[in-house]
């Protein structure tokens, strides 16, 4: 009986310590997000999700991390697009859309997919202007798949 009691106390202490660890990581993630270190914040929010998934005490932190993680990748995509690093922007916006869909944030998914389509429109336009119509058509097709409501993309696809 004494061993059982000691085991239960040890287990409860481990769960409590784990929840404290998740809280500390969450606070680091929030600080990084506030400092606009979106890559650092994304890594920490991923840790919060992984480590807090089985903890009832950390459920609200995990829920917030799941909401904020796609936004981190969205912001990294925005930073990459400002420097015209379209490949990096495309990677981050795509990751944002995938995570938003996974965690049920359809509004964030639509915003990220809208930017994916815009990047494909830029890349397709460059190929089209260089008279590389086959490449342009392939790129416009990817953009149209990302944002099927984009009528300009559909028109570009039809013209190429």
Protein language model features and the residues they cover:
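Position-specific recognition of the canonical hydrophobic site in helix A of tetratricopeptide repeat
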Residues: 33, 81, 121, 128-129
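Short coil turns that delineate tetratricopeptide repeat
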Residues: 53, 101, 148-149
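Canonical tetratricopeptide repeat
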Residues: 61-68, 75, 108, 115, ...
């Amino acid at each position: 009986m004494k061993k059982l009691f000691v085991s239960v106390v040890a287990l409860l202490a481990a769960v409590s310590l784990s929840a404290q660890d998740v809280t500390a990581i969450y606070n680091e993630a929030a600080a990084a997000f506030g400092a606009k270190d979106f890559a650092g914040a994304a890594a920490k929010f991923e840790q919060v999700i992984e480590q807090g998934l089985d903890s009832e005490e950390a459920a609200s932190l995990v829920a917030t991390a799941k909401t904020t993680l796609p936004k981190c990748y969205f912001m990294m995509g925005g930073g990459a697009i400002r420097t015209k690093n379209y490949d990096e922007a495309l990677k981050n916006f795509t990751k944002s859309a995938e995570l938003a869909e996974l965690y049920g944030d359809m509004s964030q998914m639509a915003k990220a997919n809208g930017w994916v389509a815009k990047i494909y429109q830029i890349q397709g336009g460059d190929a089209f202007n260089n008279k590389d119509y086959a490449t342009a058509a392939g790129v416009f097709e990817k953009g149209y798949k990302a944002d099927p409501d984009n009528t300009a993309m559909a028109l570009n696809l039809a013209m190429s």
